[in-house]
Regions:
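N-terminal pre-domain/capping segments
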Residues: 1-108, 178, 276-282
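Active-site acidic/histidine proton-transfer and metal-coordination neighborhood
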Residues: 79, 84-178, 268
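Generic structural signal for well-ordered alpha-helices
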Residues: 25-26, 66-70, 94-98, 129-136, ...
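A short, acidic, flexible beta-alpha connecting loop/helix-capping segment that sits on the rim
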Residues: 255-267
Length: 282
């Protein structure tokens, strides 16, 4: 079984201080997770406005950036499976990013998509693929591998035949760029996540797992319900088929990430419920 991990972004509301962070990481470990995926902007202090904006977007990052994450993950007995960053930071100083990743004992640096960026423009996507190749080559020279993490924006069509993700797959060099696939976001975007995973094959090094469904009790006003993320095995995604594909290509880690709609509004309770689904694959 690959390393079972949780993305740090899921934990923003329960990392308010050192003691709370210790308790959260201990609960993760006790639930059966062996790893954590760190976000560059959550392991360093960030400004109040950034925290405010991410909270307003429904994805609070919390105040954990001032904590000693090297000490926290070591004390919890967790493996750092990757470090999330942005392409701009890589282009400015790839060595610094690589050194930070290696200081946590991980070989993977992950680009989490582009902001204020037109994924529907074909020329822009060709350029992005070239930039990723260059950044990946710079990281490889430092002994670190670059992965690209998708959301749903990569499903935009750049022409009648291809989507943005097609260009990334076809024009990035596997020597320098591979992928962390998020099946939730492609499912949310209306795509066949399994087919894309099969197409990625062994270029999928890490897998972000989540489920999707409806959390409701009692009667509904209309027959159309809003769907959102759910604990693993409680939604409607065919996770068993996705897991079989991920295991068949030898992914290094299966990483839980959800941003909201947690049971009892608790990310810790949510990851504990999801851990029960993952236990069948231990």
């Amino acid at each position: 079984m690959p390393t079972k991990a949780v993305q740090q972004f899921m934990l923003g509301t329960v990392l308010g201080n050192e003691n709370e962070a210790r308790q959260t990481l201990a609960a993760m470990k006790a639930a059966g997770y062996d790893g954590i995926e760190l976000c560059g902007f959550m392991i360093h202090p960030i400004g109040f406005m950034v925290r405010l904006l991410t909270k307003a977007a429904g994805m609070p990052v919390g105040k954990g950036g001032s904590l000693d994450w090297h000490a926290l993950v070591k004390e919890a007995g967790l493996q750092v499976v990757s470090l999330h960053t942005d392409l701009g930071s890589l282009e400015r100083d790839a060595k610094a990013v690589a050194d930070e990743a290696k200081s946590f004992g991980t070989k993977y640096v992950v680009i989490t998509g582009m902001y204020r960026f037109d994924y529907g423009d074909e020329a822009t996507m060709h350029d992005l693929a070239a930039r990723l190749n260059k950044a990946g080559a710079a990281l490889k020279a430092e002994g670190v591998e670059l992965l690209y993490h998708n959301h749903n924006c990569e499903l935009r069509h750049v022409n009648a035949e291809k989507r943005a993700y097609d260009i990334l797959l076809e024009e990035t060099d596997p020597q320098f760029v591979n992928f962390e696939f998020d099946s939730y976001w492609f499912t949310e975007g209306g795509a066949n996540a399994l087919a894309w995973m099969q197409r990625l094959g062994t270029r999928m090094k890490l897998w972000h797992i989540n489920d999707r469904g409806t959390r409701i009790s009692g009667s509904a006003v209309t027959p159309i319900l809003k769907t959102d993320s759910m604990e693993l095995g409680t939604g409607n995604m065919d996770l068993d088929s996705l897991m079989a594909q991920a295991l068949s290509v030898g992914v290094d880690a299966v990483i839980l990430e959800s941003h909201r709609n947690w049971v009892d509004n608790s990310p810790v309770k949510s990851l504990q419920v999801s851990a029960e689904y993952l236990k069948q694959y231990t």
